[in-house]
From Swiss-Prot:
Keywords: Amino-acid biosynthesis, Cytoplasm, Isomerase, Lysine biosynthesis
Keyword Amino-acid biosynthesis tagged: yes
PROSITE patterns per record: DAP_EPIMERASE (PS01326)
Residues reported to bind substrate: N11, N62, G72, N73, N160, N193, E211, R212, G221, T222
Species of origin: Methanococcus maripaludis (strain C6 / ATCC BAA-1332)
Name this protein carries in UniProt: Diaminopimelate epimerase
Single GO molecular function: diaminopimelate epimerase activity
This protein's pathway: Amino-acid biosynthesis; L-lysine biosynthesis via DAP pathway; DL-2,6-diaminopimelate from LL-2,6-diaminopimelate: step 1/1
HAMAP family with a match to the protein in the record: DAP_epimerase
Keyword Cytoplasm: yes
EC supergroup of this enzyme: isomerase
Main subcellular location: cytoplasm
Amino acid sequence: MKFTKMHGLGNDYIYVDAISQKIENPNEISRFVSDRHFGIGSDGLVLILPSDLADFKMRMFNSDGSEAEMCGNAIRCVGKFVYDKKMTDKSTITIETLAGIKVLEMTIENDKVVLVKVDMGEPILKAETIPVLSEKHPVIDEEITAKDYCYNFTCVSIGNPHAITYIENVEEFPLEKIGPLFEIHEKFPRKTNVEFVELIDDSTVKMRVWERGAGETLACGTGACAVLVASVLKGYVGRKATVKLLGGDLTIEWNESDNHIYMTGPATTVFEGEIDI
């Protein structure tokens, strides 16, 4: 299997052109290639496929083999993958995902993609669609307790579920201990991604994320979008802000005119190779 390892702010995946090669058992392949000791090492696997609805289709799998609806960092890399490999000559493309069709605008320098702006669509705020078991709409400050820990979560879906809460110091927060307790909490029928956020100022927030099916990652694009939406709903920031993640910064905007969220950030190729599967 020919592959390209890429990352968006350190959120790394193995990217495979599944148009020119047939890929079977992607769940198993993702578990294998993601292993950082016995495989290639990544947060998961991304397949680029043909689409009847868009320019391309992406399917993505977490390191535990589960399939995810969308990943903001991964979709930026898909844009770079198809442009840099001359699978398209367009700088604006559409990608079909399980979370709908996304539009990518790519910034090109020296015939390579350096930045990608993604129209992530409208945020989902309805409890049963996120999904989260709550009577609130929107779900702001839902008190949830797991073991001895209690937080007020604001819940948003960006095609995948997110639960966001605010703390004073994200760097010292024991995420690996507390994150998984809420990821699998019974309030979330399909589990959830969990974001812990520190407010810097009215246009900057800092976050760490415990991703559903992957654990802590250096960055989560949909998580950054969800954090911006939650922070606007709570009156903490304006509609455009910098979201600081462990792997770097993303610019997120929640546009008032079309209600869409726009995410802008880098996409980086690490190396290419072949592996027996």
